Amino acid sequence: MPQTVLNDMEDRMNKAINALKRDLSSLRAGRANPAMLDRVTVDYYGTPTPISQLANISVPEPRMLTIQPWDKTALKEIDRALQQSDLGISPSNDGVIIRLIIPPLTEERRKELVKLAGKGGEEAKVAIRNIRRDANDEIKKLEKAATISEDDSRRHQETIQKTTDKFIAEVDKIVKDKEKDILEV
């Protein structure tokens, strides 16, 4: 029974790490990356649809993304969604393909992005700590129900803490790497 609690905790912590990686991948670091368009949705026939499901996204140059819709009628909708997004990039539409030229980041914008990365890391740490609390509560319930001994309970709580520390260190490393990537000129 306690092993299920530990396995569940580790699965949930892995999901928190994956969510952080997904969120940080959409922060642009001055280079073209198709993942930066993941959060942009297009109103396609009344349904919010990710751009990646409507078009081929490629990186022909380090600072340029091209978006080639499979359905040419979606071109205007994709253009509108890009203009309304928080990317801060103006799309160039030639009627067949949309080009996004990624401008170099200003020092001010880099600092903003570093803060956003740090904030995302903090949110992931809070999520991991909440998962730790839930796991500790489950172990304490098992101890109260006399399913496990007090010694086993302490041992499991120590394991939970070690696992939490490992995941917190991983969050710190991910955020540090992203900050380094953002600050790289």
Swiss-Prot record:
Q: Taxonomic lineage per UniProt?
A: Bacteria, Bacillati, Bacillota, Bacilli, Bacillales
Is Cell division one of the keywords?
Answer: no
Q: Looking at the UniProt record for this protein, which Gene Ontology cellular component terms does it annotate, in alphabetical order?
A: cytoplasm
Protein name per its UniProtKB record: Ribosome-recycling factor
Which HAMAP family does the entry mention? RRF
Instruction: Report whether Magnesium shows up as a keyword of the record.
Output: no
Q: Where in the cell is it found?
A: Cytoplasm
Task performed by this protein: Responsible for the release of ribosomes from messenger RNA at the termination of protein biosynthesis. May increase the efficiency of translation by recycling ribosomes from one round of translation to another.
Q: What are the recorded Gene Ontology BP terms?
A: translational termination
A GO term for molecular function: ribosomal large subunit binding
Indicate the family of this protein: Belongs to the RRF family.
Superkingdom per UniProt? Bacteria
**Which keywords has UniProt assigned to this entry?**
Cytoplasm, Protein biosynthesis
Q: Which InterPro entries match?
A: Ribosome_recyc_fac (IPR002661), Ribosome_recyc_fac_dom (IPR023584), RRF_sf (IPR036191)
